[in-house]
Amino acid sequence: MTVFEGNLQDTRDLKFAIVIARFNDLVVGKLLSACEDSLRRHGVAVGPDSHQVDYAWVPGSFEIPMVARQLALSGRYDAIVCLGAVIRGQTSHYDHVASEVAKGIQALAFQTGVPVTFGVLTTDTMQQAIERAGIKSNLGWEYGENAIEMATLTRKIRHLVAVRAVQPELPEQTPPSLLQ
């Protein structure tokens, strides 16, 4: 049996894109800061001169899936992080936006094979959103870690598929050392 598992260490050659919604920037800015901190602490070069992280700013969360799809199809990224916040208001707008964003992000991961982290908060109140992007607990950190883990996991799986294509005689129970 082969066991596949991502890790948080092999980040030196990984390339990430972060798609950030400007709407609800009070919350989204905090998610972005924590996500960047997570990536940085796991060895990813983050910042204006980074060769590992690119940023795409969009007006709101509804626009995230389209831009993330274009980035995924470019073939340049090992993972994409989508950051936004959809907060319930007085109309049904929230239900439509939250649902379509979630579906769009999930669909593009399936269609492109590029891991896409769903970092769009969907909350009933601004207070709930602030709590999820706050000092005590900030989900942005987890979104960064999830992107790293999924990028390293899919890289291992792709490597095994490529090795098996060249060496079909490899046993089904390939030792983990061959998957590195």
Swiss-Prot record:
GO MF terms, alphabetically ordered: 6,7-dimethyl-8-ribityllumazine synthase activity
Question: Would I find Transferase among this entry's keywords?
Answer: yes
Entry annotation: catalytic residues? H93
GO BP: any one term:
riboflavin biosynthetic process
- Annotated residues that bind (2S)-2-hydroxy-3-oxobutyl phosphate are located at Q90, T91, R132
Identify the keywords attached in UniProt to this record, alphabetized: Riboflavin biosynthesis, Transferase
Recorded metabolic or biological pathway in which this protein acts: Cofactor biosynthesis; riboflavin biosynthesis; riboflavin from 2-hydroxy-3-oxobutyl phosphate and 5-amino-6-(D-ribitylamino)uracil: step 1/2
**InterPro entries for the chain:** LS, LS/RS, LS/RS_sf
Q: What is its EC number?
A: 2.5.1.78
Q: Domain of life, per the record? A: Bacteria
Which family does the record assign?
A: Belongs to the DMRL synthase family.
Extract the HAMAP family matched here.
Lumazine_synth
Summarizing the function annotation, the protein's role is: Catalyzes the formation of 6,7-dimethyl-8-ribityllumazine by condensation of 5-amino-6-(D-ribitylamino)uracil with 3,4-dihydroxy-2-butanone 4-phosphate. This is the penultimate step in the biosynthesis of riboflavin.
PANTHER family reported in the protein's UniProt record = 6,7-DIMETHYL-8-RIBITYLLUMAZINE SYNTHASE, 6,7-DIMETHYL-8-RIBITYLLUMAZINE SYNTHASE DMRL SYNTHASE LUMAZINE SYNTHASE
Q: Which NCBIfam families match?
A: lumazine-synth
Protein name as annotated: 6,7-dimethyl-8-ribityllumazine synthase
Species name for this entry?
Answer: Gloeobacter violaceus (strain ATCC 29082 / PCC 7421)
Q: What is the lineage of its organism?
A: Bacteria, Bacillati, Cyanobacteriota, Cyanophyceae, Gloeobacterales
